[in-house]
Design a protein with these regions (language model features):
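Terminal domain-initiation and capping elements
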Residues: 1-114
């Protein structure tokens, strides 16, 4: 069995607890469905947000989603000055590390913009 990475990203309409939780759960549900994942398959999840999101941790949404035993980590994306014109506001990103026998090519990433 190997560990594979699955990336996902979405944006949220506002910096509020409800918006962050709703957007994060929607993202995780899509990734879990597209990749046929159960919480036991997930070795860890690393969430990042753009610095304009501070109302809630995406990991708190993952706990509400049922990932109580999954190791989770949150952080902010680096504020690289040259990237500011290209960066998405209110963006939530996740890197899932999953235990699987499937090849990397079988993993399905997700990007969604509100």
């Amino acid at each position: 069995m190997a560990v594979r990475g699955i990336r996902g990203a979405t944006t949220t309409e506002e910096d509020s607890e409800a918006a962050i939780v709703d957007s994060t759960i929607e993202l995780l549900a899509e990734l879990a469905r597209e990749n046929a994942l159960s919480p036991g398959d997930i070795a860890a999840a690393w969430f990042t947000t753009t610095p304009d999101l501070t109302a809630e941790f995406p990991a708190a949404a993952a706990r509400r989603f049922g990932w109580g035993d999954v190791p989770l980590l949150c952080g902010h994306e680096m504020a690289v000055p040259a990237s500011n014109p290209r960066s998405l506001p209110r963006c939530i990103r996740v890197l899932l590390l999953v235990n699987t026998d499937r090849p990397s090519s079988a993993m399905r990433d997700r990007k969604s913009v509100v």
